[in-house]
Every structure is written in structure tokens, then in C-alpha cells.
């Protein structure tokens, strides 16, 4: 019975389909077309032919002429099947490529970067994967359901009224049909007839994903359109268009642009014009643009009107054209004066200045130093508020620098040198020929003399017939003896001002060879030669092998020529260094070997090559045959070694560490498959970081071939370093300084960098937590070096994100030395000592952040996953210990918000609970004492901290904010009161109830107290609608009343004004935000209310960079000196934002000027924050702060007794991060103390050496910074660089040791007689711990380095003072000042006293207090010990 019924049903459906197409039965679309029912016109159904590709015409009777197209093209008709055109073979009729990226499993999107379980094609039946990460899911079209849209929806069961009462509903795949009784017609089955009794419900064609429909909207083809399931698109009948064929071609009423000055909106049957401001009429034809040639001042906005215009002024301006300033709009606009209304003045107000100030806004201090000869004898006049002081030149003292001092009294010249006074009474040593140095303490190599030991004694430099001595110098035995005020081989350099008296005459003598350019550099060397390419040396006398610096990028081959080099660039690249990629047009033959030309908006045009080909135009064939054989062999090796059985066991098996073996199941690659996105994954894994550029692997997916295609960084040449430093960031492009090594001339040649920060990089380290606590952030130095970026440990409100690891999950947080990590900032290259790997599964989990300075906007790393892949690839290639620590896993993960362990209370929690119980017991015992006391206890009204309960601690940490003040009402969950429970407890005080004897009132006095009540967890509340709208992108619609304006949301403790001020949405204009803020303040909003992070609306407005809102809030009484939980004021935050304009405005407030030296939680002033962050306006910001009263060398001394005091100045922070413009401003322009020690005894050059800041180290050395000073752990700057594997910086220090001393050491080693030990002079070691008996002032005094400067002054010690001092470990450094340096590597230069073995290990000659052990050793191999701090 069932089989006949089914047969009848299929017969019914087949007949119904035939009847349904109506007049298509008689239409002949030919063999090359398909007939479809078209749009219904009244009761008449039309039809149309859908032609196969290459055919057209009304009945598909015309065939396209292929002969008109190229070999790689095909001939097609347009969408109306009328016009012929040629497109590429893999393109649609509009010329758009049909090729889609073949994304790997788990990734999707146009660029295969979106990660989710349902990508790329898990969803079935037209479903689409949406979302990312844990939120990824399949969005199903109507008619399907299930996790993968694999289930058909039975519409007949879910909707009983799917068909009418007289018809029968029958379910089909994705849709359903309605069957009428025999003899009646659909849709209502009331009309009799003999045609089809079946109504087919059209299935969904495609799913539309948009901003308005993020979960998808089912789209159906209209007007007879045909759904092409292969492309999920509607093919429309002729005359119709649109994604669902919903539009008639003739219905586009806006096609003729009928609106003259407005926007045309088309609708069925007509259109409407939305006119621009100032225009009206049906077609916006009436009116004109009155804003043409308007007079509105810059910064204002012209608003067009019907007959005129008006100017919308910013808050600080007024007048018809915003040409006048409104002092009432900005508090304290008259900085040191009183604002007086003056309607007749040009500004509409006048400032009456206080004594000692001047300027339009009383912003300028009267500079007494403008008077001539205020300070005598080259003294420097320093202007002070209302006064001045004289900083005297060396050799003079007194208030006016008019008292000469005898500087030779304590100034001893060695080797028979004579001390003489210059005209400014500075002591100088006139050395005998053959000796140099500040005190003639260094002897030139045998046979050489002159001020740089660069003149041969047998030749000399002066004679009666030859060279002469200038400036009164006398020629004696071929050499010039100079008067005290001059130095140089020919007395050509003036000691006093550092200028050559001959100036241009020096270069007119043409001292430079090989067409080099001669320039005047500074006082030390007088002139310098800028060499042409291919030459080097002091006077460019030597040929240089330029190819040793690897200047060719992208696999270019370097060729050395006599005076230059050239690069043979691979196809697709050009430029002197093959650094530029050729641009091309997408033509027929652009891409070879089957490649397809794709035009991408962001990346430009490129060829997407067929498999097996690479190159810019797919011209290179990849040798896949050879590698396929190798890969096949490796796969068989993996099978023979049973790698699959040993995979994923937690141990890296080196014999299975191949891409073909999946890197031992991830055991050797941090549990990742780093080359999973790479098209040639196994091949590129083999080529990774092998030193040879492979273009097929030089892309983001293949991790840029391990950076093999990047050029080497060339150092700034020694002889032009000072030249480039003096011209750094001066606004003029100096091409010779426009290199990476020279800092790109400070951006003067438009070479700028943008910093990006990537977070949530999680690594698991097989190391005991105790050992990781000791090593701290230094364990990550090698990662920074290998990835070519800055790597830091990520942190939250509780500190560094480092957790214990039990082999399966994260446990307790590891307490790190936050101060040490903060000081490091940039974690450097490697750990030199062997790391002991944990024998068990115990380890640590560390969350990292990466900061990359992207050249010209091109970053190596797009997201955290790309960083993780690079780490994993290096682990697989170099070993899991390749970063100095054993990394067993690397992945992208968000830090957990709870810091407690998962199975038991931590010892810290137990101790806290125990301490709390002890406090309770003590107080209870006190309350039980006899009540015969007559004196009342003094009660202090202070909050008492209570150790949190276990559940409370979990709740608090689960709901805390990781980033302070960055809250949102648009989060997925909204929890009312849980977040701030600990802070709520701080408002309670714990007192015992009166017990035993005595009067409770006597015990408590008259104090009104509240017994401790631990708040219970309330039910979650819904977000406040007014707050949600304030935080959104559109205008507030909820009424702002006196009652609603100060309602506080329980989660973030914010009012509506907080949410308005923190709104940084680009879609919400600042005009609207200011307007809403005005409404709130008019309704009685508290402008100084603080949220849970103690941020006021003003602070949030500064964070959001809303300058106009900040101006209005301050006018309304907002206090800029309120500090948040990070102990930052609005000025601190403006400095952290690098917002120069906001800082200018903030410093107009006299309130903030008094707090300009205040420290934030990190112990930094606003000037220190500016110095610590690079940026375009940072020097201008620093100058502004100094002009407003910030002290250059302020170290936070006012807060010496607080934990945040570090004793550092702005120069420390600038040197630590290599902020060279700030370093040069502080040292070069403001004379900042170069040798100031912080609390750990570190000077700026020590921090720079420790962090690998080579440019800072060179500059500070040139400026005379001490290199022999030691920190609190008795380490010099060289030792800090050595311990952190910054060998290039160690090399800089070692270059300063002359060949003479090296030869003497070798001579001593060959001598068999014991020598007397050398005297060791060391700067005193600063105490690392303080005695309780010491006063705070003694322990935290800011001190200069000792011994004192050689010249007797209190400024920076002279480096020459330390030239004969040594250290016990390692070998002492001997420093030559820039005045006497010679180019390293030249035939006449001093050679470093160090070398390198083949394995990179350094050797040194020992400089010990005893040479007895070395008598029989011609050379001692010496490995420098590692140091950890």
C-alpha cells in the first residue's frame, strides 16, 4: 500500500512541475539555454531563457566569437545576453575573479585570518560560518537547522498554518509544498481549474550577512530570478538587477542625478532629494553655497545657511568669525595674571600680568638674561621666575662669575706635561709630543705623535716650507706647540667654543680623498670627511667592501665595484637594494604560468600563482620534484621510527622533529603547527631561517622565510655620528644621515615609524617557578632578539601575568619583582647560563606582549597568532631551548581573570585569613578586660582592611577589570555589584561588641560605628538605559533629569557623565557629546564624581582625547588635580597619550603647574612619561613641560620615603628606550646630568647598555658620560651589556682600549718575572640594603659618581679620569674620548684588545692584580661570567 502511494506522489510532483512552467513548454531555448518562468504581469506569467556561458540572444541562439579574445581569455555575453566581452578564464561576466582563497581548516574570511571551528566550509546547505574564536557558529538559512545546518526543518510540523485550511502541507528539503484537492487551484484552493494543484514554496537562495543582520537573513530570488546554488547568487531575467532581482533597470530614478545640491533617494515610482545646508526646492536647485571664501578662523566650522553662513566656534573662541578668544571659556587663560573683559579689544579681553611676567596671556617670564654681560667670563645665565642665576664656566665663581679660580692647584699633568690656564681659567695639560690624554697619561704607539697619535714622528706636520701652525702656535721639531686656548695638530681648534679658527679654510685645504665631502663637525675633530660609496677611513683613503653589509633585500645578489656596489634584483623587485616591489597593470599576459592577476585595495595588484610557481609574475618554477622526494622520504622515516606513537607525549624527540612528522606531534614546536597556513608548508619549514632568501616562502603565511629576505642593519659610520647627531630632527633632510643606523635623520626625510602592541601571547616554560622568580623578565631576552621586536611580560591590575603550571592547568600567580620588570621594559637578547629544566610537569605560564615599530606601516606581525607561529617555528628549527628557556607550548589565549588556584587556598590567602582571625581575637580580648578604666581610648576614623573570604576573593578576581578605566556597558554580561566588593569592605570598620565587664559606651566613646556586615551577592541587574545610550554611537533619547543624572551604575560606579566623557566612538561627534555633557551639568551632575578606578569625567575625557569637552568640564569646575588609582592626574594621562595639544591646554591651568613634578604609581612625572615614549611631538612636549617649570634632573626627591621613588630622571627613561630626540634635547640643550645614579646605582648609560641601546651609548660616550662607574651590584656599563649579550655595545667599549696597552699585556705574558700588581681604583659601591639606623635622607640621597671629576667640578666626571683604572672582573675598560678617537679598523687606529673564536666565544687578556699565573701562558682563553640582577 505504501509503494503505490509514493509512486503517485512523485508522479504528481513531476506533472505539477511541468504544468508550473506554463508557456515554457512551447519555448525552444535550444541546447544552450534553459527556460524559466519570469515576473508576473497582472495574471500573465512571462518567461525567459537563461543561456549557458558563451551563448546569448533572446533564445540563446547566438554564440560568442572566441577569436576576438586572447589565449588566457574567454568570450561571454553580458547579463542581458546582448553584448559580447572578453574576460579572464577564471572570471565571471563582469571580470571579477571566481577564485577564492583555499583556507586551511579552522580559518576563513577573505584573507583566511578569521579563526573558528566552522571555517572554511563546515556549514552545510548554504549556511555560513560567522563570528570568531569561541563565538564562531553556523548561521543557517530558512529551512535548515542544526550545529552545521545539516538538519532539514519540517515546516509542516513547526507551522500548522503553513498552508491554507483546504490544502495539504508536504515537507521537502529546505522548503515545502502545498497541494490542493484535485480540481482546485492554489494558493487558497478555492478557484476551480484543471492546471497545477501544487504550490511550490521557493527555497532560500543565499544567506546575507550584514551589520543590520549579523546572524544572517535568508534571501529569495524575485521576479523569476534563477538561483545558482554553485555561486549562491540570483541570475536575473533581462531588465532586472539587484542581489535578489528586486529592481527594474528603468526604476533607478536617481540614475540621472536629478538633485543639484543634495542626495537622491530612489524608491518605487519616484525619488526624493535630501538637500545640503543652504539649499531647497524639489531638486535642491534653490540657494547657493555661502561657505565659499568664508572668513571663519582655522579650527572653526562653517555652517551654510539660506542667505548667509555662520561660524561654529570651538569653546575657546568667540566672535562672528571665531576670531576672538573667550577667556571665560577656559579657566586661568591668563597664566600669571587676571582676565579683564575688554569688548573693544581685538581679543575681547585683556590680561593684566603679575610682576615678573609678560606676554598676551602672561605666559612668559621676563627674561633678565636678555641683558648683555649679565654673567661674566662665559658664564651661563639661567632665567628664574622673577630672578636669575649664573652657572659659571670652569675656572670662575661668584654671583656674576667674576672671581677667577686657580684650577691648576689640584690638577696634575703626567709624563712631564705642563698645566696651563686658558683664557677662561680652565686647566689644560700641554703634553710632550708622544703623549695624549686629559692629563697626558696615555702614550702613543712607538713612532707616532700628534693629538690623535695619527702623525708619524719622522714626518711631522709643520715646517718652514710646508704646513704651518695657526693661532699663535709654534713649530718645534716638526710639531706644533699650541697656546692654552687652542689644540689640534695645527692649533686649529679653539678649546673655548669648540670651533675651528680657520673654519672653511680647513676644508679649503682639501684634506679628504676620493671626492669625499668635507664638513665642519665639532670642537673635537674640527672636520670630518663624508665618504662616497665604496670608501672609508678618516679621510676616505681606503676602499670598502660594501657587500659585507648585505645591502640587497629580497634575495638580491650584491656585486662590489671600485667605488660602489650594485644589486642584481630578482624579478619583481627594483631599487638600489632591491627593496621596492614593481607595480604593474592587470593585463592579459601579466601573470605567467596560469597565474591570476588580483587587484587588492590595500596591497595593490598582485599575481596569485598556480601551484608550483612563484615570483612577482609567477615566472619562477619551484623545484617541487626534489623536495617532494625528500618529503616522501621523511614521511617514511617517521613511520619507521614510529613517531606517531611517540608524538604529543610532552618530550621533543629530535629524530621526529620534521614537518613531515608534524614536529613530533607539536612536542618540538610549542604544541603548534606553525606552517599550517603556508602553501608549501613542509618545504618552507625546511628552508626556514637558513640564511638564503626563498621568495616562495617570503610571505606572512610562511613566516617571511625566517627573515632571510631582510637586509642587515648597517651601523652609522663613526666619523659622521656626531655630525648626524647635531642635525638630528632639525627639520632638514640630510641624505647621508638617512639610514637605519643613523636613526633616519630623526624623521627629517619622512621616515617615520608606528608602534603596534600585540597581547595575549601565552607560553609555557618547563622551569621551576622559584627559578623563574630569580631570573624574572631576563628569561625572555632572547625572544626579543630573535623576533626583532620588543617583548615584555603582560600585566594586569595585580601585577605580571605569570602563573604556576601543574602540567594541565594554571595555578597560583607567581609573585614577580615588578620594579625590576618595569625598569627593564625592553627585555633583551639571551640568558647565558644553562637553565635547569624541571624534571616534572611543574613550570610556569607567562603571558607576553609584543611591541613592533613598523617601518612605513608594514609590520612583520599582524596579530598574536603570527607571533606564536614564529615562536613555534623557531622552536622546531632551533630547539625548545633556543630562546634560552625551555618553552613547551605557545598559543594565543586571553589571561584568566582569576588569580586564585583551582583546587585549594594559596598560602598567601591562608596567611591573610589567619592574620584576620588573630586581629579579631586580640580585639575581643581587649574588649573583655575589666571596665574600671577611666580614660577613653582614642578611636581613629580609618578604614580597616579585612582579609577577603574565599568566595569573595574568587568573585572579586573573576570580575575585575584588567585595564583600568576601560569599561563598557556593551559587554556580553552585566553584573551589578560583584566587582568592587573588596572596596566596599574598606568602608566598614571592625570593632568588638561590648562584652564582659565595663561599659560599651566607655570603650567606644561617642564614635558612631557600623558593625561589619559582609555584603551578600545581589541579583544581577540590567544595564541602565541612560548609561547605555551615553556610551553608544547615537544621541541620548532618555530624559536627563536631576534624579537620573547622578544615578550610579553598581558595577563601575559611574554616572551618565562618566559614560559621555569616556565615549570615544568616531560615529558620535564631539559637538553632540559636549551638548549632552552640558545637559547633564545643567541638571546637577557632579563633575568631580569618581568611578571605581577613581577616574573623574575630566580624566575620561582626556583619555578619549575630547579637547572641547575637557575645556567645558574645566569651565564647569572640574578639578584637574584629582588623581586616579594609578596615581595619575589629567596631565600624566595627556603625557601618556602623547597628546601635545591637550598638554598645552592643561598647562594653562595654574592648578596643574603646582603638581608638575608629582609622581604616578610607577614613580614617573609627566616629563619622565614623555621621555619614556617616542613620538613626533615628544620633544615639543618636553620643552613645554620644562618651560612651565619641570626640572630636567628632578628624580622624585620629594617622595624619597615612598616605594615609588626610584631616583631616576627623565634622561634615565629616555636612554632606556632609546628615545634619541629626547636624549639629545636633555643632554645637548638642557645639560642634564649624564652620570646621575638611580636607587640601584645605575646611570643612564648603564640602562642603555643593559637594554642594547647602541645609539644612546655612543652618544653619551661622545658627550663624556662615565664608562667606569659601577652600580649597586658592582657592575659597569660594559658588564651589563656583556651579561645581556649585547656584544655590539661591548665592542664599542673595547674599541677604546689602545693597541699599546694590548701589546704591553702580551709582553707581560711572555715575561717570566713576576710583576707588581696594579693599583685598582673603583667607584664606591652603593649599598643595596638600608640599615634601620640610617635616616631616610642618607639612604636615598641623589649622588654623583665617585671619584669626583678630574677637573674638580661638580658636573659630569671626565671619562679620561678612569683611563688607568681597572676592575677585578671583568677586564677593565680604557676609554678614549671622541677628541682622540681614530676610526677602528684603519691601519693607524688602535685595535680592540679582544677577538672572537669561531664559535663566537670572546677571549680577553687578563688584567689581574697578579700576573704570576700567566707567566707560562702565551694567551689565556677567558670566558666572561654571566651576571644576573
From Swiss-Prot:
GO cellular component: apical plasma membrane; CSL-Notch-Mastermind transcription factor complex; nucleus; plasma membrane; RNA polymerase II transcription regulator complex
ANK repeats mapped onto the chain: 1093-1122, 1126-1158, 1162-1194, 1206-1236, 1240-1269
Compositional bias annotation for Polar residues: 1361-1374
PROSITE patterns reported for this sequence: ANK_REP_REGION, ANK_REPEAT, ASX_HYDROXYL, EGF_1, EGF_2, EGF_3, EGF_CA, LNR
GO MF annotation: an example: RNA polymerase II-specific DNA-binding transcription factor binding
Region of interest: RAM domain: 933-952
Basic residues composition bias: residue spans: 1319-1330
Glycosylation-annotated residues: 41, 165, 194, 378, 515, 623, 751, 754, 900
The record's account of how the chain is modified after translation: Upon binding its ligands, it is cleaved (S2 cleavage) in its extracellular domain, close to the transmembrane domain. S2 cleavage is probably mediated by the metalloproteases adm-4 and sup-17. It is then cleaved (S3 cleavage) downstream of its transmembrane domain, releasing it from the cell membrane; S3 cleavage requires a multiprotein gamma-secretase complex, which may include presenilin sel-12.
Domain of life of the native organism: Eukaryota
Residues exposed to the Extracellular side: 16-908
All residue ranges annotated as the EGF-like domain in the record: 20-61, 114-150, 152-190, 201-246, 250-285, 287-323, 323-363, 365-402, 404-441, 449-492, 503-541, 543-579, 582-619
Record membrane topology: Single-pass type I membrane protein
Listed GO biological process terms: cell fate specification; cell projection morphogenesis; dauer exit; egg-laying behavior; negative regulation of Notch signaling pathway; nematode larval development; Notch signaling pathway; positive regulation of DNA-templated transcription
Pfam families in UniProt: Ank_2, EGF, EGF_2, EGF_CA, hEGF, NOD, NODP, Notch
Localisation: Apical cell membrane
Signal peptide from the UniProt entry: 1-15
SUBUNIT field: May interact with dsl-1. May interact with lag-2. May interact with osm-11. Interacts with sel-10.
Annotated PANTHER family: CRUMBS FAMILY MEMBER (PTHR24049), DROSOPHILA CRUMBS HOMOLOG (PTHR24049:SF22)
Record's function text: Essential signaling protein which has a major role in many developmental processes; involved in cell fate decisions that require cell-cell interactions. Probable membrane-bound receptor for putative ligands lag-2, apx-1, dsl-1 and osm-11. Upon ligand activation, and releasing from the cell membrane, the lin-12/Notch intracellular domain (NICD) forms a transcriptional activator complex with lag-1 and lag-3 and regulates expression of various genes. Required for ventral cell fates in the postembryonic mesodermal lineage (M lineage) and in uterine precursor cells.
Listed name of the protein: Protein lin-12
Gene name per UniProt: lin-12
Amino acid at each position: 500500500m505504501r509503494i503505490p502511494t509514493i509512486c503517485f506522489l512523485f508522479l504528481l510532483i513531476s506533472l505539477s512541475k511541468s504544468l508550473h512552467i506554463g508557456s515554457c513548454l512551447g519555448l525552444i531555448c535550444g541546447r544552450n539555454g534553459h527556460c524559466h518562468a519570469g515576473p508576473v504581469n497582472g495574471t500573465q506569467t512571462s518567461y525567459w531563457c537563461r543561456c549557458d556561458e558563451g551563448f546569448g540572444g533572446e533564445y540563446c541562439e547566438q554564440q560568442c566569437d572566441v577569436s576576438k579574445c586572447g589565449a588566457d581569455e574567454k568570450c561571454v555575453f553580458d547579463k542581458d545576453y546582448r553584448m559580447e566581452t572578453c574576460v579572464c578564464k577564471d572570471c565571471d561576466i563582469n571580470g571579477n575573479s571566481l577564485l577564492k582563497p583555499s583556507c586551511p581548516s579552522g580559518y576563513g574570511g577573505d584573507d583566511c585570518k578569521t579563526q573558528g571551528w566552522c571555517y572554511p566550509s563546515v556549514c552545510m546547505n548554504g549556511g555560513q560560518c560567522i563570528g570568531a574564536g569561541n563565538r564562531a557558529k553556523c548561521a543557517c538559512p530558512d529551512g535548515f537547522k542544526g550545529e552545521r545546518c545539516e538538519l532539514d526543518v519540517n515546516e509542516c510540523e513547526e507551522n500548522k498554518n503553513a498552508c491554507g485550511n483546504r490544502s495539504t502541507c508536504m515537507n521537502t528539503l529546505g522548503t515545502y509544498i502545498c497541494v490542493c484537492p484535485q480540481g482546485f487551484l492554489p494558493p487558497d484552493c478555492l478557484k476551480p481549474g484543471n492546471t497545477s494543484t501544487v504550490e511550490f514554496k521557493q527555497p532560500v537562495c543565499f544567506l546575507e550577512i550584514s551589520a543590520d543582520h549579523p546572524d544572517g537573513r535568508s534571501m529569495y530570488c524575485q521576479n523569476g530570478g534563477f538561483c545558482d546554488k554553485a555561486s549562491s547568487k540570483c541570475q536575473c531575467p533581462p531588465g532586472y538587477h539587484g542581489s535578489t532581482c528586486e529592481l527594474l533597470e528603468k526604476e533607478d530614478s536617481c540614475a540621472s542625478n536629478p538633485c543639484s545640491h543634495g542626495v537622491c533617494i530612489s524608491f518605487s515610482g519616484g525619488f526624493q532629494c535630501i538637500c545640503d545646508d543652504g539649499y531647497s526646492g524639489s531638486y535642491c536647485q534653490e540657494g547657493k553655497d555661502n561657505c565659499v571664501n568664508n572668513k571663519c578662523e582655522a579650527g572653526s566650522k562653517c555652517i551654510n545657511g539660506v542667505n548667509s553662513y555662520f561660524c561654529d566656534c570651538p569653546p575657546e573662541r568667540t566672535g562672528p568669525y571665531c576670531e576672538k578668544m573667550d577667556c571665560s571659556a577656559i579657566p586661568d587663560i591668563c597664566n600669571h595674571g587676571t582676565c579683564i573683559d575688554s569688548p573693544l579689544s581685538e581679543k575681547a579681553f585683556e590680561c593684566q600680568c603679575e610682576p615678573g611676567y609678560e606676554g598676551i596671556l602672561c605666559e612668559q617670564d621676563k627674561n633678565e638674561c636678555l641683558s648683555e654681560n649679565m654673567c661674566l667670563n662665559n658664564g651661563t645665565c639661567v632665567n628664574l621666575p622673577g630672578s636669575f642665576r649664573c652657572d659659571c664656566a670652569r675656572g670662575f665663581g661668584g654671583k656674576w662669575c667674576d672671581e677667577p679660580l686657580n684650577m691648576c692647584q689640584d690638577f696634575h699633568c703626567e709624563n712631564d706635561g705642563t698645566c696651563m690656564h686658558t683664557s677662561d681659567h680652565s686647566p689644560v695639560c700641554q703634553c710632550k709630543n708622544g703623549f695624549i690624554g686629559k692629563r697626558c697619561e696615555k702614550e702613543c704607539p712607538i713612532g707616532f705623535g700628534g693629538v690623535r697619535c695619527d702623525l708619524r714622528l719622522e714626518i711631522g706636520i709643520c715646517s718652514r716650507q710646508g704646513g704651518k701652525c695657526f693661532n699663535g702656535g709654534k713649530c718645534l721639531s716638526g710639531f706644533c706647540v699650541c697656546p692654552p686656548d687652542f689644540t689640534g695638530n695645527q692649533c686649529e681648534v679653539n678649546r673655548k667654543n669648540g670651533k675651528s679658527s680657520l673654519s672653511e679654510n680647513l676644508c679649503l685645504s682639501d684634506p679628504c680623498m676620493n671626492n669625499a665631502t668635507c664638513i665642519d663637525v665639532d670642537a673635537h675633530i674640527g672636520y670630518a670627511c663624508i665618504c662616497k660609496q665604496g670608501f672609508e677611513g678618516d679621510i676616505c683613503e681606503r676602499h670598502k667592501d660594501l657587500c659585507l653589509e648585505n645591502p640587497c633585500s629580497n634575495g638580491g645578489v650584491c656585486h662590489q665595484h671600485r667605488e660602489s656596489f650594485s644589486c642584481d634584483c630578482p624579478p619583481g623587485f627594483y631599487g638600489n637594494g632591491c627593496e621596492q616591489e614593481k607595480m604593474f597593470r592587470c593585463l592579459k599576459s601579466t601573470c605567467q604560468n596560469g597565474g591570476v592577476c588580483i587587484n587588492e585595495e590595500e596591497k595593490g595588484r598582485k599575481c596569485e600563482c598556480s601551484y608550483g610557481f612563484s615570483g612577482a609574475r609567477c615566472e619562477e618554477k619551484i623545484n617541487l620534484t626534489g623536495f617532494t622526494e625528500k618529503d616522501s622520504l621523511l614521511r617514511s622515516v617517521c613511520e619507521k621510527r614510529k613517531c606517531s606513537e611517540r608524538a604529543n607525549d610532552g618530550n621533543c624527540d629530535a629524530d621526529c622533529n620534521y614537518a613531515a612528522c608534524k614536529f613530533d606531534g607539536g612536542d618540538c614546536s610549542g604544541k603548534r603547527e606553525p606552517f599550517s597556513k603556508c602553501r608549501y608548508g613542509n618545504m618552507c619549514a625546511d628552508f626556514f631561517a637558513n640564511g638564503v632568501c626563498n621568495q616562495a616562502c617570503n610571505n606572512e603565511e610562511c613566516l617571511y622565510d625566517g627573515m632571510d629576505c631582510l637586509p642587515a642593519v648597517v651601523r652609522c659610520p663613526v666619523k659622521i655620528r656626531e655630525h648626524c647627531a647635531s642635525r638630528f630632527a632639525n627639520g632638514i633632510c640630510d641624505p647621508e644621515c638617512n639610514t637605519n643606523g643613523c636613526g633616519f635623520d630623526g624623521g627629517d626625510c619622512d621616515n617615520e615609524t608606528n608602534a603596534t602592541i600585540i597581547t595575549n601571547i601565552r607560553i609555557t616554560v618547563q622551569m621551576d617557578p622559584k627559578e623563574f622568580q630569580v631570573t624574572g623578565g631576563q628569561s625572555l631576552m632572547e625572544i626579543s632578539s630573535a623576533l626583532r621586536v620588543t617583548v615584555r611580560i603582560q600585566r594586569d591590575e595585580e601585577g605580571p601575568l605569570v602563573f604556576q603550571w601543574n602540567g594541565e592547568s594554571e595555578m597560583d600567580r607567581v609573585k614577580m619583582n615588578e620594579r625590576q620588570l618595569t625598569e627593564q621594559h625592553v627585555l633583551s637578547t639571551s640568558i647565558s647560563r644553562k637553565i635547569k629544566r624541571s624534571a616534572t610537569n611543574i613550570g610556569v605560564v607567562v603571558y607576553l606582549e609584543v611591541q613592533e615599530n613598523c617601518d612605513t606601516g608594514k609590520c612583520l606581525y599582524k596579530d598574536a597568532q603570527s607571533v606564536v607561529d614564529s615562536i613555534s617555528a623557531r622552536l622546531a628549527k632551533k630547539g625548545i631551548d633556543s630562546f634560552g628557556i625551555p618553552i613547551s607550548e605557545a598559543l594565543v589565549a586571553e589571561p584568566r581573570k582569576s588569580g586564585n588556584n583551582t583546587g585549594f587556598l594559596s598560602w598567601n590567602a591562608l596567611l591573610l585569613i589567619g592574620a584576620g582571625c588573630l586581629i579579631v581575637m586580640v580585639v575581643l580580648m581587649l574588649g573583655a578586660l575589666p571596665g574600671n578604666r577611666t580614660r577613653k581610648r582614642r578611636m581613629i576614623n580609618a578604614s580597616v582592611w579585612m582579609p577577603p573570604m574565599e568566595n569573595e576573593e574568587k568573585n572579586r578576581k573573576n570580575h575585575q577589570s584588567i585595564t583600568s578605566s576601560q569599561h563598557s556597558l556593551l559587554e556580553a554580561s552585566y553584573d551589578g555589584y560583584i566587582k568592587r566588593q573588596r572596596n566596599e569592605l574598606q568602608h566598614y570598620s571592625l570593632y568588638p561588641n561590648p562584652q564582659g565587664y565595663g561599659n560599651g559606651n566607655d570603650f567606644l566613646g561617642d564614635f558612631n560605628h557600623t558593625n561589619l556586615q559582609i555584603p551578600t551577592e545581589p541579583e544581577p541587574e540590567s544595564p541602565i538605559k541612560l548609561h547605555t545610550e551615553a556610551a553608544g554611537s547615537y544621541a541620548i533619547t532618555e530624559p536627563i533629569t536631576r534624579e537620573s543624572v547622578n544615578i550610579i551604575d553598581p558595577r563601575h560606579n559611574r554616572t551618565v557623565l562618566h559614560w559621555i566623557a569616556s565615549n570615544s566612538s568616531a560615529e558620535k561627534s564631539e559637538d553632540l557629546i559636549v551638548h549632552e555633557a552640558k545637559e547633564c551639568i545643567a541638571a546637577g551632575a557632579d563633575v568631580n564624581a569618581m568611578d571605581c578606578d577613581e577616574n573623574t569625567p575630566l580624566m575620561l575625557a582626556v583619555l578619549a582625547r575630547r579637547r572641547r569637552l575637557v575645556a567645558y568640564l574645566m569651565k564647569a569646575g572640574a578639578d584637574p588635580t584629582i588623581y586616579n588609582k594609578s596615581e595619575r592626574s589629567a596631565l600624566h594621562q595627556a603625557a601618556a597619550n602623547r597628546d601635545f595639544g591637550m598638554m598645552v591646554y592643561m598647562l594653562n591651568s595654574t592648578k596643574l603647574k603646582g603638581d608638575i613634578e608629582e609622581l604616578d604609581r610607577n614613580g614617573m612625572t609627566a616629563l619622565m612619561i614623555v621621555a619614556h615614549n617616542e613620538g613626533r611631538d615628544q620633544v615639543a612636549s618636553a620643552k613645554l613641560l620644562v618651560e612651565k617649570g619641570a626640572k630636567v634632573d628632578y628624580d622624585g626627591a620629594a617622595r624619597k620615603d615612598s616605594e615609588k621613588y626610584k631616583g631616576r630622571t627623565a634622561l634615565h627613561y629616555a636612554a632606556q628606550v632609546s628615545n634619541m630626540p629626547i636624549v639629545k634635547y636633555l643632554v645637548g640643550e638642557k645639560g642634564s646630568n649624564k652620570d646621575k645614579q638611580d636607587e640601584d646605582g645605575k646611570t643612564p648609560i648603564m640602562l642603555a647598555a643593559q637594554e642594547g641601546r647602541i645609539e644612546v651609548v655612543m652618544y653619551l660616550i661622545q658627550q663624556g658620560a662615565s664608562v667606569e662607574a659601577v652600580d649597586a651590584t658592582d657592575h659597569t656599563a660594559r658588564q651589563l651589556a656583556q651579561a645581556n649579550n649585547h656584544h655590539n655595545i661591548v665592542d664599542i667599549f673595547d674599541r677604546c682600549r689602545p693597541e699599546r696597552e694590548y701589546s704591553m699585556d702580551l709582553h707581560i705574558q711572555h715575561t717570566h718575572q713576576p710583576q707588581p700588581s696594579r693599583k685598582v681604583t673603583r667607584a664606591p659601591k652603593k649599598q643595596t640594603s638600608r640599615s634601620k639606623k640610617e635616616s631616610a635622607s642618607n639612604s636615598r640621597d641623589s649622588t654623583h659618581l665617585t671619584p669626583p671629576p678630574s677637573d674638580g667640578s661638580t658636573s659630569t666626571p671626565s671619562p679620561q679620569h678612569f683611563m688607568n683604572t681597572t676592575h677585578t672582573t671583568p677586564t677593565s675598560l680604557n676609554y678614549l674620548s671622541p677628541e682622540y678617537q681614530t676610526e677602528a679598523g684603519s691601519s693607524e687606529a688602535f685595535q680592540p684588545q679582544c677577538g672572537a673564536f669561531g664559535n663566537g666565544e670572546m677571549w680577553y687578556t687578563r688584567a689581574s692584580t697578579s700576573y704570576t699565573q700567566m707567566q707560562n701562558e702565551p694567551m689565556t682563553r677567558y670566558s666572561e661570567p654571566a651576571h644576573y640582577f
